[in-house]
């Protein structure tokens, strides 16, 4: 079979060479035996170089014979053959290509055409190489067959390359649009910041006016008490001056006169010893004296963001137990009985929601996770499925950050976004900005940012708590809602 293929390859190469040789003959002049230059055609139909046929007929005045067929013509008729001239140029180019291919396609060992391909050595070989000891046990096929096979393989490679090229082209086009989109996003965020700080300034101005008014009231109150005390002290001073003059006068009187009413004078002097001299304190209230350090107004604004979150037992999965104050939740292996299967209750996903949801505004709460090895916290929208099997993702109405296997943190996006947290959080802070469409998570332990979801919220959002189903020693502890302590 291999020998037949080799013979077919040889025949194909010979046929191609013969066709090229015939073309070269047709493009040659029969007089000079070179490629035709300015080819012209005479009456008999043969073609010659214009210069060659002119020299051939140089001494003739009539009966001009053809150098090939000897047929004569009465007139010197030379018609340019431009089409043949173009073919001559093509033949020259083919001759050059043939020479180059011949030089490149010859076996360096046998100087024969490399018309075959060896699969094992992945190289072109000549006919002699193919039947030699080196390549005889190998699979050798005609070059055309190998070319076709590898052409098909390359074409198969071309499709994914074109797909990747299209992907890169689309990505590049998308990236080129992003500066404009970024500019719009930055401008939107800038306006949001300006608006928020304008509101902050307004509230601070209100607090400033309130505190300044209270300060002025306190000042007027102290001034009034100072005036009253000054008047009182003035009266006492006059009384004491009169008493001192009375005592001095008594001392200058004679015995009878001095002893007259002396008891009354001495009683007045005794009362002076117990007389209390009071001064009015000008010390301001503590809040005012410490105001530059405490930033009461700003603290008051921040406190307005803190949500008073409690757990709703009507939504709790039957394997969850809530504390009496409804601030803690833990997983138990034994399912609680006699719980009504209300529409609000989760029966597949062991989680619990808060009693209050949010449809606007900014809200902040903190969850103590301690040393638990498995948990998830976040929010879900009001319309989520609570009965059947579900995958809690943003697409299904859940925005969560979770921990599993003790050290694997992720934002439950599609696919999950791994979170590389340096310090294990003992407490997680959650900040919802409904209008801005952001839900941010913070590591309260080291005061670092964990992750922020960005979405468009259109329904009521409920704080969600999942204590984990692995009730091992460390994970048996509950999730607990804690009031933020940094505001005090």
From Swiss-Prot:
UniProt-listed InterPro entries: B30.2/SPRY, B30.2/SPRY_sf, Butyrophylin_SPRY, ConA-like_dom_sf, PRY, PRY/SPRY_TRIM39, SPRY_dom, TRIM/RBCC
Record region (Interaction with CDKN1A): 268-307, 359-488
Residue ranges of every copy of the B30.2/SPRY domain listed in the record: 289-484
UniProt record, GO biological process: apoptotic process; mitotic G2 DNA damage checkpoint signaling; negative regulation of canonical NF-kappaB signal transduction; negative regulation of proteasomal ubiquitin-dependent protein catabolic process; protein stabilization; protein ubiquitination; regulation of cell cycle G1/S phase transition
UniProt GO cellular component terms: cytosol; mitochondrion; nucleus
Alphabetized UniProt keyword annotations: Apoptosis, Coiled coil, Cytoplasm, Metal-binding, Mitochondrion, Nucleus, Transferase, Ubl conjugation, Ubl conjugation pathway, Zinc, Zinc-finger
Zinc fingers (B box-type) by residue: 102-143
Keyword Glycoprotein tagged: no
Subcellular location, record wording: Cytoplasm, Cytosol; Mitochondrion; Nucleus
GO molecular function, one term: zinc ion binding
Principal location listed in the UniProt entry: cytoplasm
Zinc finger (RING-type): 29-70
Reaction equations catalysed: S-ubiquitinyl-[E2 ubiquitin-conjugating enzyme]-L-cysteine + [acceptor protein]-L-lysine = [E2 ubiquitin-conjugating enzyme]-L-cysteine + N(6)-ubiquitinyl-[acceptor protein]-L-lysine
Family membership: Belongs to the TRIM/RBCC family.
Cited function: E3 ubiquitin-protein ligase. May facilitate apoptosis by inhibiting APC/C-Cdh1-mediated poly-ubiquitination and subsequent proteasome-mediated degradation of the pro-apoptotic protein MOAP1. Regulates the G1/S transition of the cell cycle and DNA damage-induced G2 arrest by stabilizing CDKN1A/p21. Positively regulates CDKN1A/p21 stability by competing with DTL for CDKN1A/p21 binding, therefore disrupting DCX(DTL) E3 ubiquitin ligase complex-mediated CDKN1A/p21 ubiquitination and degradation.
PANTHER family: E3 UBIQUITIN-PROTEIN LIGASE TRIM
Record text on subunit structure and interactions: Interacts with MOAP1. Interacts with CDKN1A.
The name this protein goes by in its record: E3 ubiquitin-protein ligase TRIM39
Organism: Mus musculus (Mouse)
């Amino acid at each position: 079979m291999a020998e037949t293929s080799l013979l077919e390859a040889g025949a194909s190469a010979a046929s191609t060479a013969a066709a090229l040789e015939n073309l070269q003959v047709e493009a040659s002049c029969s007089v000079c035996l070179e490629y035709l230059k300015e080819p012209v055609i005479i009456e008999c139909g043969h073609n010659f170089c214009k210069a060659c046929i002119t020299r051939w007929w140089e001494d003739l005045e009539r009966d001009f014979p053809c150098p090939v067929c000897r047929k004569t013509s009465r007139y010197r008729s030379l018609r340019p053959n431009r089409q043949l001239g173009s073919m001559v140029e093509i033949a020259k180019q083919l001759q050059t290509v043939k020479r180059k291919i011949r030089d490149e396609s010859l076996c360096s060992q046998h100087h024969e055409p490399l018309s075959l391909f060896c699969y094992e050595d992945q190289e072109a070989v000549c006919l002699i190489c193919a039947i030699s000891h080196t390549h005889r046990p190998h699979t050798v096929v005609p070059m055309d067959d190998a070319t076709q096979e590898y052409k098909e393989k390359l074409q198969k490679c071309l499709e994914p390359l074109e797909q990747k090229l299209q992907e890169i082209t689309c990505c590049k086009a998308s990236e080129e649009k992003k500066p404009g989109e970024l500019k719009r996003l930055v401008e939107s965020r800038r306006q949001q910041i300006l608006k928020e700080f304008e509101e902050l300034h307004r509230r601070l101005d209100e607090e400033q006016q309130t505190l300044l008014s209270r300060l002025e009231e306190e000042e007027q109150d102290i001034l009034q008490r100072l005036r009253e005390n000054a008047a009182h002290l003035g009266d006492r001073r006059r009384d004491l001056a009169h008493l001192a003059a009375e005592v001095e006068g008594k001392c200058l009187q004679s015995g009878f006169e001095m002893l007259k009413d002396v008891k009354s004078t001495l009683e007045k002097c005794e009362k002076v010893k117990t007389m209390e001299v009071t001064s009015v304190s000008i010390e301001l209230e503590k809040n005012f004296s410490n105001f530059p350090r405490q930033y009461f107004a700003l603290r008051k604004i921040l406190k307005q963001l803190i949500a008073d979150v409690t757990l709703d037992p009507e939504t709790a999965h039957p394997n969850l137990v809530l504390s009496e104050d409804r601030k803690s939740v833990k997983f138990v292996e034994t399912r609680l009985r006699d719980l009504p299967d209300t529409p609000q209750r989760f029966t597949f996903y062991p989680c619990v929601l808060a009693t209050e949801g949010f449809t606007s505004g900014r809200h902040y709460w903190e969850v103590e996770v301690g040393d638990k090895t498995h948990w998830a916290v976040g929010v879900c929208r009001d319309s989520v499925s609570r009965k059947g099997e579900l995958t809690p993702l943003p697409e299904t109405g859940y925005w969560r950050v979770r921990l599993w296997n003790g050290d694997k943190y992720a934002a439950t996006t599609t696919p999950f976004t791994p979170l590389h947290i340096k310090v294990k959080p003992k407490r997680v802070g959650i900040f919802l900005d409904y209008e801005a469409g952001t839900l941010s998570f913070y590591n309260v332990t080291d005061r670092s940012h964990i992750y922020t979801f960005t979405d468009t919220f259109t329904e009521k959002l409920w704080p969600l708590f999942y204590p984990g189903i692995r009730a091992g020693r460390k994970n048996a502890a509950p999730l607990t809602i804690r009031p933020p302590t940094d505001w005090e």
